[in-house]
Structures are given as structure tokens and as C-alpha cells.
Amino acid sequence: AFGKYKKDLLPKLFSLFSHNLHKGIPKSMVDAMGLDRYKPADIAFNAQIILENKLEGLFNKALEISDNVVYGGGVALNCVANSKLHEQCKGNLWIFPNPGDAGGSLGAAALAYGKKVNWEHPYLGFNIEPSKPIKALAKEIVIHIKKYGMCGVAVGPAEFGPRALGNRSLLADPRGAKAQDQVNTIKRRQKFRPFAPAVFEEDVNLHFKPGYISPYMQMVVDCTDPNLPAITHKDGTSRIQTVSKNEPTIFRAILEEWKKRTGCSVLLNTSLNIRGEPMVNNISDADRFEEKYGVKVFY
């Protein structure tokens, strides 16, 4: 969103794809290609163009075989590319919630098991039993967000994957820029990085471009609601999480209580951790997070 297309940069970046870049680009190559003359944002923008072009070609081949595509790998966390692939597949695209190397462990286990596994949800981690009935706890959480702007939630089994989907989340009011600044400060993130909105599946069209169901935060869509600055990126998009009526966690109850008290069916949702640290897993982690960062964590 911050970079620009550079016609002379594309072939230079394309030539790098024949090298192993896991450890970065060697300085000798940077110097030889004059890459240090370009802004990092421009390099990222043009690398994204190459990635999307390559993926489009691969998907064209896959769609010759089937109308349905299952897509994995760490690159499947690239939400901008995913949205374009979703359109290319006319919506018939499924991405595992943990598509990177770590998610392969579950696939290996399923293969060893040797039987069909019915995928229900990604809540497979350590379980924190709620301290009180779900509706009562959801009410406390929403009252706290209304008063202080944000809070943490650590209830139920942890998510299996890199996205916090409501069980290990830091939630905030998305209707003002103040909340975005507060959360960025706590999480020690760069100011330009956007946060994700969680929204009722049935209310997506009220706030975002219609046609996208994304329960695992895997795609970006145009935000059409000007009253949600905290979850809208510079390019006008949002990485949405859609929450269905069948959501098996406390998160649906929290959103319902939030809408009842504010009229808004969207919450800012980000992972309950600090940059460089793992997500909160158990009650001890939750207590430590609350004490260290001064953010109330409900469980």
C-alpha cells in the first residue's frame, strides 16, 4: 500500500527468485543490482506483483484439473494475494488455518492415522475453562472495552495457527484511531501496520465489499464504512474475520453483546502477545501479560 510500481525494478527482483533467499539477499547482490537505490516499500510492492503473477499461473493449471482448489504453504498467509486467488477460483478456494510448515504436523498426523478426519475448527490447543457462564463473561468483557477501549481474552482452547480468532485475542473498539494507537503501543508494532476486524458473517455487507466469507483472517476486502479507521489500511482494505452463528467459542457471544450495547457489529481483533513473543497460552501467561502490560485479560 505504501510502495509504487517500478518498471526497471521488476526484472531485477525476478532474477533473484532463482536463488535461496531464506537468509536474505547477500550484500554483494544488493550492490551489483543497485537495490539499495530503491525504497523498501517499492521493493515489497514489486515483489508482490511477481508473486501474484506466479500464483495466478499455478492456479490456472490447477483449475484445468478441478474447479475446487486447496492451497497451502507459508505463502498462503499472504492475504492480498489470497483475495485475488479467491476471485480467480470464483470462491471455490480453501486454505488451511495454519498453512505454513507448522500446520504440516497435523497433516502428517492425519496421514499416519489413515482415516478420514472431519475438520470442524482450529481450536485445538490448551484449554482455559471460562471463570463464569459465557454470557456473563461476555458482558463483563464488553463493558470493559467500552470503558477502557480494549482488553485481552483467553478463554477456551487456543487457536492452532498464527491468527488469533477470539480465544487468545486482544480486542478493541475499531471506531476511532485512538484504539489503534493504544494497541500499537502495547504490541510494539510499526504504526503503519493495520489491524483486523472481526464481524458477524451476516453483517459483512454492512461494512465491507460483499462476497467474502473469511473465518480465519485469510483475505483482504475493501472497507466501505468510514467509521472504522482502526481496522482500515491506507489502501482502504481490511483483513476480515467473519464470525458465523455456529462459532463454537465465546467470541460470538462477545460480538453479540458488543452490538447490543454499541450498535456496531465489528471489533478490532489481534493476537494476545507482544511482538517477538508467543501468544498467551495458559492462565499463568494471561496473568503475566496483564501485570506486565497493564491490560486486563479475561478468562
Which stretches of residues belong to each language-model region?
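Short glycine-rich phosphate-binding loop at a beta-alpha junction
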Residues: 65-74, 152
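Secondary-structure capping and boundary motifs in well-ordered enzyme cores
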Residues: 40-43, 47, 51, 73, ...
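Gly-rich Lys/Arg/Thr-decorated short loops/hinges at beta-loop-alpha junctions or inter-strand turns
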Residues: 29-46, 233-239
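Flexible beta->alpha loop and helix N-cap segments adjacent to enzyme active/binding sites
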Residues: 1-27, 77-78, 82-299
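Phosphate/ATP-binding catalytic cores across multiple sugar-kinase/actin-like superfamilies
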Residues: 45-69
